[in-house]
Amino acid sequence: MTEPHANKQLEILRFIYDTVEERAFPPTVREICSAVDLSSTSTVHGHLARLEKKGYILKDATKPRAIEVTEKGREALGIKPKDIPIVGVVTAGQPILAVQDIDEYFPLPPDLENDAGELFMLRVHGESMINAGILNGDHVIVRKQSSANNGEIVVAMTEDNEATVKRFFKEDGYYRLQPENDTMDPIILPVVQILGKVVGLYRNNID
């Protein structure tokens, strides 16, 4: 394969990656044509086939526009894996003071690579969310956001500047932070600040 072809394939790969990063879904073949100055869609299909053969992209035959840039493809573009900051410990039992310091970083799981939000991780202490599968010592992956829908699991800051992991409910005139443990009572608050929504879970040990 000649060098110009290789460069064109990397150009296509970069456009696919940037488009998915920007809008969370890949471009059409015609959009690729326009972006890389190719007039023939068949030429683009040929480049995509070669990129797939190299292991730079994955395509789903059942979904024409489903194109995913693989880890190998990102390496070819010089893109390092994303990391999530681990910002401390949060309780799943009694609320504790929120920790904002960044302790370390954790590699972003592949299934969250297209998440457009700002993510962080917290280590969970306590057993109030065990019925939701969140155990003492787990790390929750949180998308930073200030609102949530009823029933979603959130990290919330109470009026005493304490953070807790609970299931969120907005009731008539108050907020209910509901534990997922039949032996524990909900936290009832007139005001609550949501720090983010729990979107993932990491556990590094199995009992």
From Swiss-Prot:
DNA-binding region per UniProt: 29-49
Active site: 128, 166
Organism: Lactobacillus gasseri (strain ATCC 33323 / DSM 20243 / BCRC 14619 / CIP 102991 / JCM 1131 / KCTC 3163 / NCIMB 11718 / NCTC 13722 / AM63)
Site (Cleavage): 92-93
Matches recorded under Gene3D superfamilies: Umud Fragment, subunit A (2.10.109.10), Winged helix-like DNA-binding domain superfamily/Winged helix DNA-binding domain (1.10.10.10)
Pfam families attached to this UniProt entry: LexA_DNA_bind, Peptidase_S24
Subunit description: Homodimer.
Function comment: Represses a number of genes involved in the response to DNA damage (SOS response), including recA and lexA. In the presence of single-stranded DNA, RecA interacts with LexA causing an autocatalytic cleavage which disrupts the DNA-binding part of LexA, leading to derepression of the SOS regulon and eventually DNA repair.
Annotated keywords: Autocatalytic cleavage, DNA damage, DNA repair, DNA replication, DNA-binding, Hydrolase, Repressor, SOS response, Transcription, Transcription regulation
Enzyme class: hydrolase
Family, similarity comment: Belongs to the peptidase S24 family.
Protein's UniProt name: LexA repressor
Catalysed reactions listed for this entry: Hydrolysis of Ala-|-Gly bond in repressor LexA
MF-aspect GO terms: DNA binding; serine-type endopeptidase activity
